[in-house]
Amino acid sequence: MFQEKQLKDYSNYLSVTLKRDKDDLLSSWQISNLLSQISSQYYKNELLNTISLALNDGIQPENLFILNDSFHINNSYSKLGILNLNNSPDIKSFYHLGRPTSLLPNEKLFKIALVFDCFRQVNEKLSNQKVTSMNKDLLLDFTTAIHSNNDLLNILDEIKTHAHNCLKNEDTNRVQTIQKINKVITDSQTEFEKYENNKLTLDLMIDDIKNKMYDTSQNKKYKELETEYFNIFFSKFHNLKRPIVGIFYPESNKIQILCSNFINKKNRDERFLDIKTISHNSPYLIDFIIGTSIALPLLKVLILIKEKNKLNKKNQQLDLTAPKTDQELDYMISQLSTLAEATENKASQTIDLPYLKDKIIESQEQNNEKFKAPLNHYGFANREVEISVQTTAKTKFTDSPNM
C-alpha cells in the first residue's frame, strides 16, 4: 500500500501571524469565511501534493478516486483510514462517504458507484412510503459480486427484487412506488450500458494518456468522453469544500483514504491547521500554525505583499508595529522557497504523465490563487505578516499497522 506518511516531512511546521491593515470592523461571518477558506485551500493543497506523491510512487491513476460529498466537520470519522470492502462495517462506512469517481475511468469503481447510487435512491423511494428499507448488509453481497466480476445487470436486478419484497405487504401506492423503483433500476442499467458501449474507446484513451500520446484536438469522440468521464474528478475537487480522496486496491478490495489525519478527529498530527489566536481588537490579528505544504501559496502571498506600494497614510496612522522591510520579507521568502523545494511540494513537477501533470499543476495554481484572494480582500496581505519555520518534536511517522 501507499506509505503516505513515510513520504512526507514532519520535521517542520510554519508559525504564521497575520495583522489587518484596515481599521473597519469585520463581521463574524467574514472572519469565519476567511478561516474556512484558509483551512479548505490548505487541505486541498495537501491533497494535491499527496495525489502527486501517490502517482510518483506507482499508484495507477485509475485507482485514485474522489467522493461526491465533502466530509462533515461535526463527524469524528474515527475509523477512517483503511477500509476493507470484504467486510460489512467497512462497506457501510464507504457507502456513507459518498459516490466514488476515479481519476481515470475504472470499471470496478464505476460499478460500485452505480450500485451505491441505485441502492440509495431505491431506499429513498421506500422511505418516502414509510416502508422498511433494504438492509445495508446487502451492500457486502453486491460489492463482493462486483469484486468477483459478476454481471452488474444481474446485481441491479437483485436490488429490484429486494425492493419489491420490501413492498409485498403494502397496499397504499404500491404500484406507483414499484414504478418509481423500476425507473431507478432502468436508469442505472442505461448508465452502465452506456459505459460499456464506450469502454473500448475509454481504454484506448487511457492507453494514449499512459503512452504520452493523448490528443483530443484530433479526435472529437475523445473530447466528448473526456468531458463525461475524465474531467469529473477535478470538477468535484474544485467544487467541494472538503473533498475526500482515496486509493482503491482492486486485488485486495480495500480502500485507503488519503490525508485522513485532516478528517479523523482522533488522528490529528502536526500538519493540522491550529488557530492559536484571533484578536478582534483593531487591528484584527490571526495567529496559527500550519504544515509546510502551504509554503508555495504563502510564498505567493509574500510576493504580492512585496509588490504592493508602501502603506498608505491612513494605515500609517494606525497604532501598528513597524511594517516589514524588503529585507525581512526577502528572508521569509527565502525560507518558504526552501520548503517549496521539498520533494512533496514539488511532486507534481515530476509526474511522468503530461496529461495528469498539467491537470494537477493547473489545480495547484487555482488553489494558490484561492488561498491568496481572501487574505488580500480582507486586508491581511500586508507588511505586518510574520512567518517562521519551526521544528517539531516528532520527525517521523509510521502508517498504521493494518495498512
Where are these regions (language model features)?
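Acidic, Ser/Thr/Pro-rich beta/coil linker or hinge segments at domain junctions
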Residues: 373-403
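Intrinsically disordered, low-complexity segments enriched in glycine/proline and serine/threonine
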Residues: 114, 127, 310, 393, ...
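C-terminal, beta-strand-rich globular interaction domains
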Residues: 1-4, 400-402
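Membrane-active, amphipathic/fusogenic segments and juxtamembrane/transmembrane anchors
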Residues: 2-290
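Periodic self-assembly scaffolds
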Residues: 288-382
